[in-house]
């Protein structure tokens, strides 16, 4: 199973490092056939919140098939306005088994039209999609 974690400039470090650690530990202990990787729009280093720099394993153009896509939260204002990012998320949503988010990553899923009608309560607020 291929688990891709989408990262971008100003992504929240815990939002991608936490899932990466959990799934890579599960792989080490039980799920040897899992492949966990970070994906960014390009292969260039990404500067997450707090100046934390990370090198994605893949870009939009060279990643393997994704079974599970995790879209992380962070300062996503610029991502919400990138047509190529939204198109990529929407495309992966049509081919992946699961597309999920951490925290405010849900806004990218909503903007990419990957959510049906749902009610969410991230960070104590209520949003209708």
Q: Where are the regions a protein language model picked out?
A:
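Extended, subdomain-level signal for the structured scaffold at the beginning of enzyme domains
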Residues: 1-99, 106-111
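A short beta-strand/loop micro-motif in the catalytic core of glycosyltransferases
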Residues: 99-100, 120
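Alpha-helix capping/helix-boundary segments
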Residues: 105-106, 126
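A conserved active-site-flanking secondary-structure segment within enzyme catalytic domains
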Residues: 115-129
């Amino acid at each position: 199973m291929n688990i891709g974690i989408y990262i971008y400039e100003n992504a929240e470090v815990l939002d991608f490092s936490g899932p990466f650690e959990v799934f890579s530990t599960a792989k080490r202990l039980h799920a040897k056939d899992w492949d966990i990787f970070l994906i960014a729009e390009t292969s260039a280093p990404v500067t997450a919140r707090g100046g934390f720099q990370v090198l994605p394993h893949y870009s939009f153009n060279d990643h393997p098939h994704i079974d599970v896509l995790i879209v992380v939260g962070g300062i996503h204002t610029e991502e919400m306005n990138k047509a190529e990012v939204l198109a990529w998320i929407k495309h992966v949503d049509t081919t992946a088994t699961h597309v999920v988010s951490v925290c405010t990553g849900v806004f990218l899923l909503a903007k990419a039209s990957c959510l049906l009608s749902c009610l969410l309560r991230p960070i104590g607020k209520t949003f209708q999609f």
